[in-house]
C-alpha cells in the first residue's frame, strides 16, 4: 500500500534569520501559539552540526499557517526573523525608517543652473549625492564677429585732415647726395590717390582736403654758385 503525501503548499512555513542557538524545540515552542504543529526543524550543517540560520515549520491546517505568517518579522529567540510560506520563498526584511538608505532621484527641473548653463545641458545621474552635479559642457558656438580688421569707410573717417598732414610732414622730400649738382624744376606737383575706393563719399572730400598737392622744396646747388 502506498501512502499519499499530504499537500503542504499552504501549511509549510519558511523561517529565516534565526540565531545560531535556536533549536527544533525552541522553534516549535514559538509557533505553538498559532495552532497545531506537524513538524518544526532547524536546518543545520552536516559537518559541524551548527544551525544555518533558517528552518521550516509545518502547521496542521492552512488557517494556523496564515496566523503564523501574519507578522512577517517576528522576534524569535531574541532576534528578528522573517516568516513566509515556503512555496513563496524568503520574504525580505522590512527596514526601519531610521535605517533606510537610498539615493533620491534628482529631477532636472529641480537642479540649479550654475554659471549660466542652460538646463538642457545638465544631465543629472541617479547615483550621485544631491547638489553634486557634473555639468555636461557643450562646445562653444562660433562667434559672429569677424576676427579680421574692418577696413571700411567708417574706419578711414577717423583719420582727420590734421593727422594725415602730420603723417606726411614726417617724410619731407629731399634730394639724394648724388644729385646735389642738379636743380629740379620748381612748381611741379602731384596728386595723392585716395586710400581706398570703397571710402564713403563724405570721407572722400576730407581726404582730398587733407592730402591735396604736395609742393616740393626748391633745391639749391651749393657747388654751382
Curated annotation (Swiss-Prot):
Compartment(s): Nucleus; Cytoplasm
Record note on domains: The RRM domain is necessary for mRNA stability and mRNA translation regulation.
Keyword line: Cytoplasm, Differentiation, mRNA processing, mRNA splicing, Nucleus, RNA-binding, Translation regulation
Coarse class of the protein's main subcellular location: nucleus
Function: Multifunctional RNA-binding protein involved in the regulation of pre-mRNA splicing, mRNA stability and mRNA translation important for cell fate decision and differentiation. Plays a major role in pre-mRNA alternative splicing regulation. Mediates preferentially muscle-specific exon inclusion in numerous mRNAs important for striated cardiac and skeletal muscle cell differentiation. Binds to intronic splicing enhancer (ISE) composed of stretches of GU-rich motifs localized in flanking intron of exon that will be included by alternative splicing.
GO CC annotation: cytoplasm; cytosol; nucleus
GO biological process: 3'-UTR-mediated mRNA destabilization; cell differentiation; DNA damage response; mRNA destabilization; mRNA processing; mRNA stabilization; negative regulation of cytoplasmic translation; positive regulation of 3'-UTR-mediated mRNA stabilization
Species this protein is from: Xenopus laevis (African clawed frog)
Expression induction or repression: Up-regulated by the myogenic factor myoD during gastrulation.
InterPro entries, A to Z: Nucleotide-bd_a/b_plait_sf, RBD_domain_sf, RNA-binding_reg, RRM_dom
Pfam family, one: RRM_1
GO MF terms held by the record: mRNA 3'-UTR AU-rich region binding; mRNA 3'-UTR binding; mRNA CDS binding; pre-mRNA intronic binding; sequence-specific mRNA binding
RRM domain: residues covered: 11-88
Superkingdom assignment: Eukaryota
Protein name: RNA-binding protein 24-A
Amino acid at each position: 500500500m502506498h501512502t499519499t503525501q499530504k499537500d503542504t503548499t499552504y501549511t509549510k512555513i519558511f523561517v529565516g534569520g534565526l540565531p545560531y542557538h535556536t533549536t527544533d524545540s525552541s522553534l516549535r515552542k514559538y509557533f505553538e501559539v498559532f495552532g497545531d504543529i506537524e513538524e518544526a526543524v532547524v536546518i543545520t550543517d552536516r559537518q559541524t552540526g551548527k544551525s544555518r540560520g533558517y528552518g521550516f515549520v509545518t502547521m496542521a491546517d492552512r488557517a494556523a499557517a496564515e496566523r503564523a505568517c501574519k507578522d512577517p518579522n517576528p522576534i524569535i529567540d531574541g532576534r528578528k526573523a522573517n516568516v513566509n510560506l515556503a512555496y513563496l520563498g524568503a520574504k525580505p526584511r522590512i527596514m526601519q525608517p531610521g535605517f533606510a538608505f537610498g539615493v533620491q532621484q534628482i529631477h532636472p527641473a529641480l537642479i540649479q543652473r550654475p554659471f549660466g548653463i542652460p538646463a538642457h545641458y545638465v544631465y543629472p545621474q541617479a547615483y550621485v549625492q544631491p547638489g553634486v552635479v557634473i555639468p555636461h559642457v557643450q562646445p562653444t558656438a562660433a562667434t559672429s564677429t569677424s576676427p579680421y580688421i574692418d577696413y571700411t569707410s567708417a574706419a578711414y573717417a577717423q583719420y582727420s585732415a590734421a593727422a594725415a598732414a602730420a603723417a606726411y610732414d614726417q617724410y619731407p622730400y629731399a634730394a639724394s647726395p648724388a644729385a646735389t649738382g642738379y636743380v629740379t624744376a620748381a612748381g611741379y606737383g602731384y596728386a595723392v590717390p585716395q586710400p581706398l575706393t570703397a571710402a564713403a563719399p563724405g570721407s572722400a572730400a576730407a581726404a582730398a582736403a587733407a592730402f591735396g598737392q604736395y609742393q616740393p622744396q626748391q633745391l639749391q646747388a651749393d657747388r654751382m654758385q
